[in-house]
Amino acid sequence: MNKSTLAIVVSIIASASVHAAEVYNKNGNKLDVYGKVKAMHYMSDYDSKDGDQSYVRFGFKGETQINDQLTGYGRWEAEFAGNKAESDSSQQKTRLAFAGLKLKDIGSFDYGRNLGALYDVEAWTDMFPEFGGDSSAQTDNFMTKRASGLATYRNTDFFGIVDGLDLTLQYQGKNEDRDVKKQNGDGFGTSVSYDFGGSDFAVSGAYTLSDRTREQNLQRRGTGDKAEAWATGVKYDANDIYIATFYSETRNMTPVSGGFANKTQNFEAVIQYQFDFGLRPSLGYVLSKGKDIEGVGSEDLVNYIDVGAIYYFNKNMSAFVDYKINQLDSDNTLGINDDDIVAIGLTYQF
């Protein structure tokens, strides 16, 4: 693979924000903006997942150098639906909004709407062209993905002592004034990852424990004062190959019809190969199995094979197709959609 193509692909995959356009950098103050336009269409027999799914994401990252040891920073990111009527008030949502301080070699501390500690593991397989990352990770579901009220401490290279050993400690304040499936009580989470001093192989683990709300315990399904989850993952990223997998379990946390699953067992895997002419085929699998669900017993909540590909024209423009081959039974007790979905589209990002 030639070096210029490799640099483009690595930067795209690592994070959308790495394309940020620097709008200000002077006297220790820096401001970058980033975003993407995803023009996308779903094809499915499931009506709510058939049709235009286009959206725009936009954000900024800023930092200020307070002194040679201390830096302040903030980040905001929002998404705007491109398939809604202009009069629809639901067309915009805030994905990230946090600010914090970073002390050299000690770590960073921030507060706001951020990514939960469990997602530090789950993110390794959330690499499909469109789908994926939805077995145990769900937005505003305790600390499994993006969530509100998160106080987060992150330390890289373990205080400068161990290269590649990263640590996260996180606290989440209660959020009760919302839909019951998006509520949470006070909770704590942690994650750790290690790449063996910069090797191509890495391992990770995470654990979260939260109080559940009174309203959650009144639901027909899923009882218990605590919501708990753990996850462990491995990945390999070298020689144009990306392979990652993780296993996780949740207790009284994952939403189902009528409440929550008392237990879930979750597995995800992805393998991708980067060709030097810009094509990146992808093969993945996602499974979430609910256990001990009242009136149901055991039931697959998510189960699909994912086949897709991305073609990078350059660092800013790409085309993709992603086929979600649903493996759920059509007569599943919880009434979960079992239809396949094909996503196709173009992405421009900066």
Curated annotation (Swiss-Prot):
Keywords: Cell outer membrane, Ion transport, Membrane, Porin, Signal, Stress response, Transmembrane, Transmembrane beta strand, Transport. PROSITE patterns: GRAM_NEG_PORIN. GO terms for biological process: monoatomic ion transmembrane transport. The keyword NAD does not apply. It comes from the Bacteria. It is found in: Cell outer membrane. Residues 1-20 form the signal peptide. PANTHER family: OUTER MEMBRANE PORIN PHOE, PROTEIN YDDL-RELATED. Belongs to the Gram-negative porin family. This is Outer membrane porin PhoE.
